[in-house]
Amino acid sequence: MSIQIFNSLSRQKETFVPLEEGKVKMYVCGPTVYNYIHIGNSRPVIVYDTVRRYFQYKGYDVKFVSNFTDVDDKIIKAANELGEEVHELTERFIAAYFEDVTALGCKKADVHPRVTEHMADIIQFIQVLIEKGYAYESAGDVYYRTRKFNGYGKLSHQSVDDLKIGARIEAGEKKDDALDFALWKAAKPGEIFWESPWGNGRPGWHIECSVMAREHLGDTIDIHAGGQDLTFPHHENEIAQSEAHNDKTFARYWMHNGYINIDNEKMSKSLGNFILVNDIRKQIDPQVLRFFMLSVHYRHPINFAKDLVEAASAGLERIRTAYNNVKHRLTTTVSLGDHSDEWLNKITEQKAQFEEAMDDDFNTANGISVLFELARIANIYLNETNTCKKVLETFIETFEVLGDVLGIEFAKEEELLDEEIEALLQERVEARKNRDFARSDEIRDHLQAQGIILEDTRQGTRWKRG
């Protein structure tokens, strides 16, 4: 089955057909780096990291670009409040961003372009729009002529006339029409600026992504993605800029993930329910956070609540336990039976079910349901009188491959503490005294599976980490 993507542009699922066979060009709007990212910011990072992983699983060569907005009103304000230089602030929070998303199991993009590295490209792009009549200069600012672009509103499914009703010109703005938006902003006293044909200033927010996407992926890209809140005006304005400049379709598929609520309320600083990833990942296993985020389809809203996160933690533990039990059986069983086509077919069927779920607009919720079923089947198999090496290995491989698509690690076991090892060894001594050799061997095998090497001597049992 081909991959089906819900395209925000058409508001329906479409079969994914890449611009270039076997390749995917994908752009995801990244953060404005003036603070740590909150859990709402983390959802698109996790979602589109998973989308990228699934494309790679299906054999596609993916070029994945995600930007940093490293100059912006919020950044300038934060730098002034903290008494830092803008570049110092942004460097600090870019480093913090990578720490957070790496903890969440996300891979780095192939390119993480920064606005400040593309000023010449941005200025040149704006000049072309002016030459084509799509933009105009006004007292040091440059604005986009929204009404000149015939397709404006096609992504957010709004008409220009409807948008006009709520639009207004703010004090100090020097634009011809309330719908026009800034491509270049004249510098205010004391602000960071770059030289341009229109005077000192810096770019508007929307122009940045149009330029960086074009520079790193070309005039037309396969997939442009981001949070639902970016649909309008940000992505709508990107389309207007890019298609006016390039005379080509900007992006063929638009993907938008849903919002995150906290205990059924919108997350906001005023409500005091603003959760930073940097804080929450110290309280909750980041893998549990990722598993939780993927337990709901990406287009649906998700409610972050303690009981739901705890349920996700218990669910992930069920799958990990099944995986580790299979792995333990493989390393400890001396006599293994002949392989069974019946069980191998059951595993293959689950893998096919997983692909069917992910092919259907990256339905990770259904994909996780498949992992639960795989764990259930594995537990049933482990109760068989004879188990087969081939089947056990196939279970392990399938857990690991499907887990990797979701960015979930099943193999990672917490290292036993010295005190836990000593307690198990004491229990083993008692078992041997009571001639409970089965329990003694079970403890030995469990420790060996965790890389603990035992040496029985006349003075007692010594141990070391392998």
From Swiss-Prot:
Its EC number is 6.1.1.16. A motif ('HIGH' region) lies at residues 31-41. It comes from the Bacteria. Keywords: Aminoacyl-tRNA synthetase, ATP-binding, Cytoplasm, Ligase, Metal-binding, Nucleotide-binding, Protein biosynthesis, Zinc. A motif ('KMSKS' region) lies at residues 266-270. One of its GO terms (biological process) is cysteinyl-tRNA aminoacylation. It catalyses: tRNA(Cys) + L-cysteine + ATP = L-cysteinyl-tRNA(Cys) + AMP + diphosphate. Zn(2+) binds at residues 29, 209, 234, 238. Its cofactor is Zn(2+). One of its GO terms (molecular function) is zinc ion binding. GO terms for cellular component: cytosol. Disulfide bonds: none annotated. InterPro entries: Cys-tRNA-ligase (IPR015803), Cys-tRNA-synt_Ia_DALR (IPR015273), Cys-tRNA/MSH_ligase (IPR024909), CysS_C (IPR056411), Rossmann-like_a/b/a_fold (IPR014729), tRNA-synt_1_cat_dom (IPR032678), tRNAsynth_Ia_anticodon-bd (IPR009080). Its main location: cytoplasm. ATP binds at residue 269. Belongs to the class-I aminoacyl-tRNA synthetase family. This is Cysteine--tRNA ligase. It comes from Lysinibacillus sphaericus (strain C3-41). The gene is cysS.
